Amino acid sequence: ENVTKGPALVVGNHNAGITFLEPIGLGARWYLEKGLNDTLHFLVHDAMVALPLLRTFLIRTGCVRASHETANKLLQRGKKVVVFPGGNLEAFRPYKNRYKITFGGKKGFIRLALREQVPIVPVVLVGGHETFFVLHDGARIAELLKLKKLVRSETCALFLGLPWGLGFG
């Protein structure tokens, strides 16, 4: 409602594992309220941008590869940037913690907002964790496989949900 004009860092919690229906819903609602004159730019994980068909869709909807450099450039150009600091750790939190916000100690978004002198707009997304059950976060497996270094992931979760069935990611 009362979001400032000009650049801002929109900070939200990350839900729903490998789906991205909530960010799509946020973007659609923002568009209905603000139109094309004040669009959102979502920072997305490298793995999402690496998939050719998905990359095309993401780019067309204003998404960009998540990096400090990209966020800096967008904010300096007066854009609104959406970040989900909790990343995979939060997206794949156990079902019993579905209503908890888990940023995992990540505070880079605060430093970014201070450095660029832009406001932080908090956003809370709920409902995504109602569509699937994280049976195990797989943090230890991710650590053993060095996934944080290889693909910037702190989890290798085991989950159950539609339409995926039993999966991991």
Give the predicted meaning of each segment.
Residues 5-73, 77, 87-104:
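Catalytic core of membrane glycerolipid acyltransferases/transacylases, capturing the structured
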Residues 73-169:
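Non-catalytic C-terminal accessory region of glycerolipid acyltransferases
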